[in-house]
Amino acid sequence: MRIEAISRGAKKIFLIEKNIKVFRSLKSNLELIGSTKVELVNEDSIKYLKKLEHDAFDYIFLDPPFNQEILPLVLNLLSERKLIHSNSQIYIESEFQITEEFLGNNCDYECTIDKEKKSGNVYFCLITLGLI
């Protein structure tokens, strides 16, 4: 889905992957398609977001490892570091259902859950951010 965004007009994509095996697989696939619009980073996402200097993103895909409580940290970092803006959209996969209460506790923006589903043990949703 993230790489597919290139074919749908995304100007640039950042992929942050800590697992070296997954990183190498992604790198190999990106080399096959020859995309120069993807920045692939092999690092812990929390550490990377803490130092990232970038304008706010329009679209963000979050698929953190389950049972590690990373999602609240990432959402807070995105808000604090101004890496999101009103009208940003965030796609989230998690082991628990994302609620507006959860989002309100972990994001400085008004959040609207546009779509949500469950497949097996995975919940996923698309949210749109509103004004702070």
Segments predicted by a language model, with ranges:
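Class I S-adenosyl-L-methionine-dependent methyltransferase catalytic core
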Residues: M1-I132
